[in-house]
Amino acid sequence: MSAKSKGNPSSSSAAEGPPAASKTKVKEQIKIIVEDLELVLGDLKDVAKELKEVVDQIDTLTSDLQLEDEMTDSSKTDTLNSSSSGTTASSIEKIKEQANAPLIKPPAHPSAILTVLRKPNPPPPPPRLTPVRCEEPQRVVPTANPVKTNGTLLRNGGLAGRPNKIPNGDICCIPNSNLDKAPLQSLMHRPEKDRSPQAGPRERVRFNEKVQYHGYCPDCESRYNIKNREVHLHSEPVHPPGKIPHQGPLLHPPPHLPNFPLENGGLGISHSNSFPPPTPATVPPPAAPKPQKTILRKSTTTTV
């Protein structure tokens, strides 16, 4: 370009045209940019107007909350003075904070309701003292008034003095002659010895279906059917020492059985030395020969 301009002076005038054209193009582009900026400013003004409308709607909605006058005035001045997007955003945040602040403060009416609800509530100590007073007589009653029995107490509360039903349904028959002279014992010794024997050698106790023991008394001489199973009969008479055996079969006391509980909490027969046995004078002599005692056991033995 420089070589051509030096050789031909006419070409230099032609070369000065392109810079002038470029300047005009730049000016046109600047005008276009300014117009675009004006459009953007117009859009921003529209957005500001919309934000003001939103703020007015918020004020109308929050007017029912009875806001303080100072806070409402400050919010209005902030919204009117905001002219740019940054100021409008800050004013919106302030309005949100001011709208949330009065909600945290409790109004006057709910506080009055709370005070009314607190007054009728009774103090906690009185209801705690009432059960303690009720428990004291319950602890004193069993120790102060011991119940006298004949030494044969069942765990379910029944007495063996009169015909009583054992929990499994059988009836325990004991003659009344042995009850008057039997040793008396109170309930206070029961916790020490949980196993209480039954007085009287003649009694009938029926256990669960696996093991059955039948002792016959003078009033009950019937026999039970053991559901067609094998039965072992023990019919050997036992004579106490120092007595002459009678011609007819004599009664013998039931064998010593271990103490074991029934299914529903009762106690089995136990002839231990924990309770003194009744005196021999209290037992009336048999008037007539009676059938010999038999012990019926099933072939299937169980450990309790």
Swiss-Prot record:
Regions annotated as coiled coil: 33-70
BP GO annotations: positive regulation of cell size; positive regulation of translation
Low complexity biased stretches: 1-22, 77-91
Bias kind Pro residues: ranges: 120-129, 275-289
The keyword Cell membrane belongs to this UniProt entry's keyword annotation: no
Record keywords, A-Z: Coiled coil
Positions of the UniProt region annotated as Disordered: 1-27, 66-109, 114-133, 236-304
Note: Overexpression causes embryonic lethality. Conditional overexpression leads to increased cell size.
General function of this protein: Regulator of cell size that promotes cell size increase independently of mTOR and Hippo signaling pathways. Acts by stimulating the translation of specific mRNAs, including those encoding proteins affecting mitochondrial functions. Increases mitochondrial mass and respiration.
Protein name: Protein Largen
Source organism of this protein record: Mus musculus
